[in-house]
UniProtKB/Swiss-Prot annotation:
Species classification: Eukaryota, Viridiplantae, Streptophyta, Embryophyta, Tracheophyta
Signal peptide positions on this chain: 1-19
Record family assignment: Belongs to the ribosome-inactivating protein family. Type 1 RIP subfamily.
Name of the protein this chain belongs to: Ribosome-inactivating protein luffin-alpha
GO biological process: one example: negative regulation of translation
């Protein structure tokens, strides 16, 4: 019996002491600490070099090397550790103590074989794409406030796994971490919301939806004299629709920080990638 107890304890300790690659704590946080965290997250994503000085994510990765881990702590010090796919910055699932929660999708199921080993696995009742999360939350992203207070609430919700509020919590965490790592503008929008919650701007939602399209056109522009083969329409910070046609646009030169690798993700680009996170 003693040996059995020791074994259970060893499994619990192994699952609950996962070493994260990047960390962010809301306790004592500031714009500086948040920007450092987002910068660290970008650096934690291995790349295939750059395209027009923008980091090009790996086309593929295998085994445990396909994932990076980030630990997020609320104002009370309660923490969750989140698994992120390094090829697309998609969140696969998260760990609290000895229990892990993964999205109900093939990529997340694969991730569960390599991260949070020894944990008790719970499969969430939805996948991680925006459409499914919004349906589960009963709200679209445009209606869900972002900010440090919202992040605190989201971490708390996932820490205790409140099933009725988890989907909305994921929407907050995805935008505060993954989307902010993809776009400097979104990082700045979160910083503006350090002390308050506010719904995302139309420009934020637009950039999130068009990340894959922008990634593709920026890569294709390399063989087209810097011109997009297909213009990408986004909404700017004034609420105006703007057509992006080449790599001289500020969206390319000052905003986007990561590119989804087009050459090895053709199938993904052929899907409705804007629905994914």
């Amino acid at each position: 019996m003693k040996r059995f107890t020791v074994l259970i304890l060893a499994i619990f300790v192994a699952a609950s002491t996962v070493e994260a690659d990047v960390r962010f704590s809301l306790s004592g946080s500031s714009s500086t600490s948040y920007s450092k965290f987002i910068g660290d997250l970008r650096k934690a994503l291995p790349s295939n070099g750059t395209v027009y000085n923008i980091t090009l994510l790996l086309s593929s990765a295998s085994g445990a090397s396909r994932y990076t881990l980030m630990t997020l702590s609320n104002y009370d010090g309660k923490a969750i550790t989140v698994a992120v796919d390094v090829t697309n910055v998609y969140i696969m699932g998260y760990l609290v103590n000895s229990t892990s929660y993964f999205f109900n999708e093939s990529d997340a199921k694969l991730a569960s074989q390599y991260v949070f080993k020894g944990s008790t696995i719970v499969t969430l009742p939805y996948s991680g794409n925006y459409e499914k999360l919004q349906t589960a939350a009963g709200k679209i992203r445009e209606k869900i406030p972002l900010g440090f207070p919202a992040l605190d609430s989201a971490i708390t919700t996932l820490f205790h796994y409140d099933s009725t509020a988890a989907a909305a919590a994921f929407l907050v965490i995805i935008q505060t971490t993954a989307e902010a790592s993809r776009f400097k503008y979104i990082e700045g929008q979160i910083i503006e919301r350090i002390s308050k919650n506010q719904v995302p701007s139309l420009a934020t939602i637009s950039l999130e939806n068009e990340w894959s399209a922008l990634s593709k056109q920026i890569q294709l522009a390399q063989t087209n004299n810097g011109t997009f083969k297909t213009p990408v329409v986004i909404t700017d910070d004034k609420g105006q629709r703007v057509e992006i046609t080449n790599v001289t646009s500020k969206v390319v030169t000052k905003n986007i920080q990561l590119l989804l690798n087009y050459k090895q993700n053709v199938a993904a680009f052929d899907e409705d990638v804007s629905a994914k996170h």
